[in-house]
Amino acid sequence: MADEKGVTSEYEREPVPEHAWLGLKSYVGQFAGEHVAGTELMIGPLFLAAGVSAFDFFAGLFVGNLLAVLSWTLFTAPIATRVRLTLYYHLEKICGRRLVVLYNIVNGVMFTVQAGAMITVSATVLGVFFKFRMPELSDTLPTGFGWVVAVLATGVLFSVVAAKGYRVVAAFANLVAPLMVVMFVVFGVIGFRKMGVTGLDNFWEIASTRIWTGGEPQPGQVKFTFWHVMFFSWFCNMVWHIGMADLSLFRFARKSWYALSSAAGMYLGHFMAWIAASTLYAVQLQADPTNTAVLPGPLAYNACGALGLLVVVIAGWTTANPTLYRAGLAFQALVPEASRAKVTLITGLAASVTAIFPVVIMKLMGFVAMWGMILMPMGAVIFADYWLLPRFGMRRFIAEHVRLPMNWAAGTAWLASVVFSVGLLMAFGADKIFFVSFPSWFVAVLVYVALSRSLQRSYPPDINA
């Protein structure tokens, strides 16, 4: 999962000039590095806890990640390389300042919760040393004083670094990215060996009968099929591709097809890393079927000892810090007079409090799906505004042209899409959260185009000139 788009923040309110455009190599390295993150150590085991079969797992991952790559390539990058604006400035020109402020609030809250999940990942390392009780899959509340202290200590440390030393953390993250990829390969090799895989001749037999067996899910988990895996793999980064957050990233790309570089992150990162992480959980269950806890610290320690623990710390550290930084920036936009460091520190403390409650990390897949469901509609608005409005004789960037503080057509489309998603969940069950964003995208597009017609009719005839 992507957490920090490390591209420079220059040209925040103007198109990126040609001399600042970047080549393909920049994007291959960035995607490969940022998608082998702390979240992978949680998500991989959760597939296994969901009782997925080997075929559904591998086929779903392959197709879902392919759809994610195509979404970046066909939806995000073509607009990004034509307009070359940040997401926030692009939205401001369409929606008006007030709606962008609301978007920032929601985005900041989501980033804060995700940072809390990464703090939880790293805190599990302390549990290996101090032997306090750590959360299980079914836990929703703190499991004891030791857990609370470990999480708060980790969170405070991460918050201080995010507030004071982001440049150092970003440089460190880029430095260790190759190590992270290598270590996930090592995790996978060790996991498969311990499960009895000796070569390609018995790989599928072991994978389908001893690892991804397709049995009943762990208590409290949703049973996963091919469709669950496919849609989750596709939509776990929905905010970035269909949700258009990566307009800010690809505005620097020389060509729109550079978005194919996202395959490095999807297949080297998500595909490989999720498989590797889930094998570690299989090893744990083989040793003790009653030990269903999904805890990255113990999982990595059992595989690689102290080096495994170091990987967990680095993965959580390099993921949580840029996530806290982004959350701080989102909230600082609401109070420009406050220092970024102070806002980031407060945000980090809030993330630490959320991290105490294991329900966040144990339901990480559902949280990621909900995040996409809430923010995806604004990506649909951007898509419709750029490609569809001119085809129907309407003007793009209406808020900029008539100085609207809030584009009610965009706001209504956002609300209608979310309400439609919630309605589907109420009708068909909360376990369908991995699917509802697909039809809801079309709802957002249709509502925005229809209401934009009414909105633009209320302005002078030359508005569409």
Per-segment meaning from a language model:
Residues V149, A153-E205, L260-M266, F367-A380, ...:
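Membrane-interface loop-to-helix entry segments
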Residues M1-D56, W212-G214, Q218-F231, F250-Y258, ...:
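Membrane-interface "cap" regions at the ends of multi-pass membrane proteins
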Residues A49-G51, A77-P78, I94, L102, ...:
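Membrane-water interface regions at transmembrane-helix termini and the short interhelical loops
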Residues A123-T124, L179-E216, F231, M238, ...:
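Hydrophobic alpha-helical segments and their helix-loop junctions in multi-pass secondary transporters
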Residues F132-K164, P178-F187, W227-D246, F271, ...:
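Transmembrane alpha-helical segments of multi-pass small-molecule transport proteins
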Residues V100-S138, G316-A333:
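Hydrophobic transmembrane alpha-helices that form the core helical bundles
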Residues F62-C95, N104-I119, Q284, V447, ...:
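Juxtamembrane transmembrane-helix boundary signature
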Residues G379-A465:
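C-terminal membrane-solvent junction of multi-pass transporters and transport-like membrane proteins
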